[in-house]
Amino acid sequence: MKRNFDSVKRLVIKIGTSSLVLPSGKINLEKIDQLAFVISSLHNKGIEVVLVSSGAMGFGLNVLDLETRPAEVGKQQAVSSVGQVAMMSLYSQVFSHYQTKVSQLLLTRDVVEYPESLANAINAFESLFELGVVPIVNENDAVSVDEMDHATKFGDNDRLSAIVAKVVGADLLIMLSDIDGLFDKNPNVYEDATLRSYVPEITEEILASAGAAGSKFGTGGMMSKIKSAQMVFENQSQMVLMNGENPRDILRVLEGAKIGTLFKQED
């Protein structure tokens, strides 16, 4: 299927913790700089971009020099609150190199479930777009409790990115991950696994091919990405799942390159 994203004027990009934090726990500064360059380039072309960024836990572990994610909910929230400050500080610094202004929006599930607070959130996004600001969104881990096993959480930032795409009326959601896209079976187990370039619907076969996942820094897996694609379909939008190793590939995707997996219902 030929890809054409010429009509995309509003875009949500989701980046996961594994793309921001190295296996050693150190912050991937080079990748963050590339991401800021790409988003700034799109912004300069008149495309409105929202960045949904995980990473608060990973940044917090780095700042506090902790090797493992705490088991206790309160400590998880504390580490995330420390990490969120560090992450936004770095984003603000890096984006400023490209003369791009950013803001922070921390959401909880109840914000989008109640009409009044949802309207306020929409107004905030629209006002930021009018001001030429790139909103950076994360879940408010310091006060949310259900991803951390307890119900004000979205579940993970894959789901959050799909919800944000709906809230802002995005033309496209690009989800950056540590895999190349959706395969017909687990590529870490089967050498003959084949990348699916195009998915027009979420079938039982596709659901069955989604395995478990998550790193010590993050929470998302393939199943959460499939469920996010289902939400995107329900909102009559589209999603690309691609490897976040080289953020500049986002520009190639928007030019029509067949990178990753395109989730798009047939016209």
From Swiss-Prot:
First-level EC class: transferase
Keywords: Amino-acid biosynthesis, ATP-binding, Cytoplasm, Kinase, Nucleotide-binding, Proline biosynthesis, Transferase
NCBIfam families named in the record: proB (TIGR01027)
Biological process annotations from GO: L-proline biosynthetic process
GO CC term, one of those recorded: cytosol
UniProt: ATP binding residues: 14, 177-178, 219-225
Family indicated by similarity: Belongs to the glutamate 5-kinase family.
Positions contributing to substrate binding: 54, 141, 157
Subcellular location: Cytoplasm
Annotated function: Catalyzes the transfer of a phosphate group to glutamate to form L-glutamate 5-phosphate.
EC number: 2.7.2.11
Recorded metabolic or biological pathway in which this protein acts: Amino-acid biosynthesis; L-proline biosynthesis; L-glutamate 5-semialdehyde from L-glutamate: step 1/2
Xref: InterPro entries: AceGlu_kinase-like_sf, Asp/Glu/Uridylate_kinase, G5K_ProB, Glu/AcGlu_kinase, Glu_5kinase, Glu_5kinase/COase_Synthase, Glutamate_5-kinase_CS
PANTHER family membership: GLUTAMATE 5-KINASE, ISOPENTENYL PHOSPHATE KINASE
GO molecular function: ATP binding; glutamate 5-kinase activity
Listed name of the protein: Glutamate 5-kinase
SS bond list: none
Catalytic reaction annotation: L-glutamate + ATP = L-glutamyl 5-phosphate + ADP
